[in-house]
Amino acid sequence: MPKFIAVKLIPKGPFRDIPRADTLFGAIGNAISAIHGQSAVEELVDAFVGGARISSAFPYSGDTYYLPKPLSVEPALEGILTGLDEEERYTTAKRLRKAKYLDLKNFELALRLRPFTIPEEIPYARVDVPRVVLDRVTQDSSIYFWEEIRFREKSGVYFLYSGPREVFDGYIAPAMRFLGDTGIGGKSTWGAGLFEVEFHEMKIDAPGSEYSVTLSNALPTKTPVLWRLLRKGGWSFGRRKPRMTFIAEGSIVKNDPGGMERLELGLSHEVYVYGLTFPLGVELPEGLE
């Protein structure tokens, strides 16, 4: 049974968004650069090219951890819902298709295409918050809105780490403690993205298979089996990064580690875009293998 380190972010306030793996890796790299210098970032990149992995962040509530619904369940819904009458099967299938997350127990069932249930609710909400900006010349005010994520009590986000313990202790753990005070995802001066961090062991009972569900958004090197596309851009030290096409968490791949992109943005150092898969074995319905 695969064993991972769960990096649990206990929020001190709202987050701008739930960070994906490329955002987490970029933040970790920036933290390591601030702590140890740019040469340590190159060592971190080498460790991940050599096999270390992080997942995207997902919500938790207390001791309940949520994971992305594998896309492999959607073509298998007819078999999963066997035994239900037509109306109930239609209603349940509609809810299953809309579901984004499953708790750990039902995620493990979904990996094996066994009947599973979806959570009644998730432990956060997206909220539009009004802000006021003043014109520097006229002092006229205007209102704008920005979206933030607010968590329920005893809830937050976590991500998984897989790889050598020395890489975690030397890079990931100190970087996350640093980021807890400086913030992740922007607007830390407003109190967003600040957190306390805890580390826990987490096991996931996944089947042995040459097919995998990725728990990170990834830049595939082969054609995925089942996928949902995700376009992401962003900024790095004031320079705009090009929009890149990822496959989203929950996509299904076959023996594909993904890739890491190096960008030249006219800075004193290269910028790395994390696109490695975080694979867990998954069973596929007949006809897709």
Swiss-Prot record:
Signal sequence bounds: none
Gene designation per UniProt: csm4
Family from the record: Belongs to the CRISPR-associated Csm4 family.
Keyword Plastid recorded: no
Subunit structure: Probably part of the Csm effector complex, that includes Cas10, Csm2, Csm3, Csm4, Csm5 and mature crRNA. Interacts with Cas10 (csm1).
Molecular function in Gene Ontology: RNA binding
Protein name, per record: CRISPR system Cms protein Csm4
Function recorded in the entry: CRISPR (clustered regularly interspaced short palindromic repeat) is an adaptive immune system that provides protection against mobile genetic elements (viruses, transposable elements and conjugative plasmids). CRISPR clusters contain spacers, sequences complementary to antecedent mobile elements, and target invading nucleic acids. CRISPR clusters are transcribed and processed into CRISPR RNA (crRNA). The subunit probably binds to the 5' handle of the crRNA, helping in discrimination between self- and non-self.
Keywords: Antiviral defense, RNA-binding
Additional comment: Encoded in a type III-A CRISPR locus.
GO biological process: defense response to virus
